[in-house]
Amino acid sequence: MLSRLFRMHGLFVASHPWEVIVGTVTLTICMMSMNMFTGNNKICGWNYECPKFEEDVLSSDIIILTITRCIAILYIYFQFQNLRQLGSKYILGIAGLFTIFSSFVFSTVVIHFLDKELTGLNEALPFFLLLIDLSRASALAKFALSSNSQDEVRENIARGMAILGPTFTLDALVECLVIGVGTMSGVRQLEIMCCFGCMSVLANYFVFMTFFPACVSLVLELSRESREGRPIWQLSHFARVLEEEENKPNPVTQRVKMIMSLGLVLVHAHSRWIADPSPQNSTTEHSKVSLGLDEDVSKRIEPSVSLWQFYLSKMISMDIEQVVTLSLAFLLAVKYIFFEQAETESTLSLKNPITSPVVTPKKAPDNCCRREPLLVRRSEKLSSVEEEPGVSQDRKVEVIKPLVVETESASRATFVLGASGTSPPVAARTQELEIELPSEPRPNEECLQILESAEKGAKFLSDAEIIQLVNAKHIPAYKLETLMETHERGVSIRRQLLSTKLPEPSSLQYLPYRDYNYSLVMGACCENVIGYMPIPVGVAGPLCLDGKEYQVPMATTEGCLVASTNRGCRAIGLGGGASSRVLADGMTRGPVVRLPRACDSAEVKAWLETPEGFAVIKDAFDSTSRFARLQKLHVTMAGRNLYIRFQSKTGDAMGMNMISKGTEKALLKLQEFFPEMQILAVSGNYCTDKKPAAINWIEGRGKTVVCEAVIPAKVVREVLKTTTEAMIDVNINKNLVGSAMAGSIGGYNAHAANIVTAIYIACGQDAAQNVGSSNCITLMEASGPTNEDLYISCTMPSIEIGTVGGGTNLLPQQACLQMLGVQGACKDNPGENARQLARIVCGTVMAGELSLMAALAAGHLVRSHMVHNRSKINLQDLQGTCTKKSA
């Protein structure tokens, strides 16, 4: 029951960090300000001459207090030294934050308790530092640091609070009760010390339960920078902290503490209420003391300095014991900052880095293809099956398999122990470990035990042994990436498996696979990965569109395409730029349902077309997403089959998955009103997706965009090398009449699909959707005072595009989206990035149309393609697969 309550508390605090932090700080400031502004305004030594009660200050008291301060500083130093052994700057920073804020809360409480008398704080701080226990705070931080995502951070903090909260609460209670016994001793100094101790314990507990978990959650959220799908603060040697901490609380110890606390409660109750002397006597004595104090009235004096100067002088004036304490603190701080790192690294170098490596993330290179950190990187002679396929498995395995940890300048990942990601290479010591493997693959049973072992795992198996397990059906081939220590090794092993089954074993030699962030691919973009396909990316621009300039990335293997589009962009820019508008925005999904009779289908159709029916379906549809908002239904019949075309906004996502989820929920709601309805398929090709369809050309799908520009006659002659009249003539007879003669649907253009597909591949879109997205009609007219200028427009009714999800999560594709300023979701106006990308696509299509039509009108098309789009390699010197086979 208690664990569940603490778990709920931890989840709430971690999920609302800003609210908790602001609330805690506000409460602390309120405690201080209420005392400052409601107390008296007498400040002894500044504006009042207060009566002094002389007390004998023994030199032994000063010595004891100095020793206590030094011990407290040493204690804090050793605690931070132990934390540094973990090798995480986040643990240190978070622990420091905990210490600083705990001190602030404790100081506030002491000042409030002593009515602004700061001399008591000087004596209290050493006891506070001695009672700080960073082990609990660091344990909770470890829970958070073992997470892979921000949601997992919250869950792990909640789990940590469920495990640590009851224990820490009981410990705080017992400490307060034990230390509180000293407040009943009758010795004034001991009572003050014990009172400070109790306040210290309570301040620590308050910060640990409120401010600290919220701060951990917020710090990790703000510092989250993904690398191979994991945050930069994720430490692999914290992966087992959960199971370790779950077994920590000792039931016997817990019971003893509970019995102790009950006994101490009885002691306090007996001493304070049962055995307390007569309250009348104490009241009389108190009144006498009060009267005595009142007789010696404080005298008001005129302050000689300002209040801040008064407090500053009190802080600057130091006694010999304070000089000793500050000197010790300064020396330890210098040692910790400048000399501790090398000692820590030399100590950690003796430990096994296989179980606790800290991977140092590096900044991504300019091409945005990040290198995946490899915990274990095989050498080129790693196993009997080489990295490149086509090698027989009969070759022997190397006996020694080095695990190399290289420096930042190398092509492999770097392991840095006890240092942050920005540490210099000198501090980043490297080491080479060796794992001995038998010369022959071990039996499957032994390999399975190693694979399933928490201490060893796949890194202790050779590639030949992994392949042996795959062939024996112990490892599914599609799970290689998730079971290996790195995704790249899983891809490598799959290539080796595949090479033996290909007609040409060396077929994959020139298909690259190294140094790619496969964590962004898995579960999102592709399965059974064997590498990635590099495609040349060119840039066309600047495209002057709606008063802005864009450099448009285009991934293509067709020569002349980028150059031609670039010429069109130049012509548009010289003509003053293009203008565009988004006419409609709505993705569609068209399921098919069946009813017993055609009349029943007609009844459902009529009900869906009523405002009441549409409202019911819209409520069900809209409940599935923050962005999906049903706009309209287009319903048609074919016999007893009913086709319902849902159209909805989908924010910055292309939206097929989003609208499919909403459609499914809406159909289930519709089935409640018409139980006899049968759902045949959530997609009945009435959408229509990735197929030529007149409904997309007429009704639109995705973004409907129109773009226009006026090209001056001079630009037509000098840049496009033709005339306005010739271009209009070719456009009418080619794009309009020619397409009509061919029975084209939406193909009233020269080559819109070229530009659309090139941009789609570069920007991570679904390339198959160029079928509908390339629907375009290009119109040209004579314009200007003398009808020599060229007016051109492109209307594209079905651009299916998005800036989040799918391939847009891949880093190279994100780089291309960033070139256009539309990467990710638009926070201010959801959907605006996707709409802007659709405008850019339409504007670039118009540039491509302009240039190609000019080339056709001038007769330059064949000549340019002979220069830029023709291979100059003598193919007779190369033997293809079929030629080689026949030979």
UniProtKB/Swiss-Prot annotation:
Residues 40-56, 115-123, 188-191, 276-314 are lumenal. The lineage of its organism: Eukaryota, Metazoa, Chordata, Craniata, Vertebrata. Pathway: Metabolic intermediate biosynthesis; (R)-mevalonate biosynthesis; (R)-mevalonate from acetyl-CoA: step 3/3. Changing S60N: Abolishes sterol-mediated interaction with INSIG1, and no ubiquitination nor degradation. N-glycosylated. Glycosylated with high mannose chains including Man(6)(GlcNAc)(2), Man(7)(GlcNAc)(2) and Man(8)(GlcNAc)(2). Deglycosylated by NGLY1 on release from the endoplasmic reticulum (ER) in a sterol-mediated manner. The gene is HMGCR. There is a cross-link at K89, K248 (Glycyl lysine isopeptide (Lys-Gly) (interchain with G-Cter in ubiquitin)). It is a multi-pass membrane protein. It catalyses: (R)-mevalonate + 2 NADP(+) + CoA = (3S)-3-hydroxy-3-methylglutaryl-CoA + 2 NADPH + 2 H(+). Residues 61-218 form the SSD domain. Changing A333P: Abolishes sterol-mediated interaction with INSIG1, and no ubiquitination nor degradation. The modification Phosphoserine is found at S871. It comes from Cricetulus griseus (Chinese hamster). PANTHER family: 3-HYDROXY-3-METHYLGLUTARYL-COENZYME A REDUCTASE. Changing I76A: Greatly reduced sterol-mediated ubiquitination and degradation of HMGCR. Completely abolishes the sterol effect on ubiquitination and degradation of HMGCR. A motif (INSIG-binding motif) lies at residues 75-78. The chain crosses the membrane at residues 10-39, 57-78, 90-114, 124-149, 160-187, 192-220, 249-275, 315-339. Changing Y75A: Very little effect on the sterol-mediated ubiquitination and degradation of HMGCR. Marked reduction in the sterol-mediated ubiquitination and degradation of HMGCR. This is 3-hydroxy-3-methylglutaryl-coenzyme A reductase. Catalyzes the conversion of (3S)-hydroxy-3-methylglutaryl-CoA (HMG-CoA) to mevalonic acid, the rate-limiting step in the synthesis of cholesterol and other isoprenoids, thus plays a critical role in cellular cholesterol homeostasis. InterPro entries: HMG_CoA_Rdtase (IPR002202), HMG_CoA_Rdtase_cat_sf (IPR023074), HMG_CoA_Rdtase_CS (IPR023076), HMG_CoA_Rdtase_eu_arc (IPR004554), HMG_CoA_Rdtase_metazoan (IPR004816), HMG_CoA_Rdtase_N (IPR023282), HMG_CoA_Rdtase_NAD(P)-bd_sf (IPR009023), HMG_CoA_Rdtase_sub-bd_dom_sf (IPR009029).
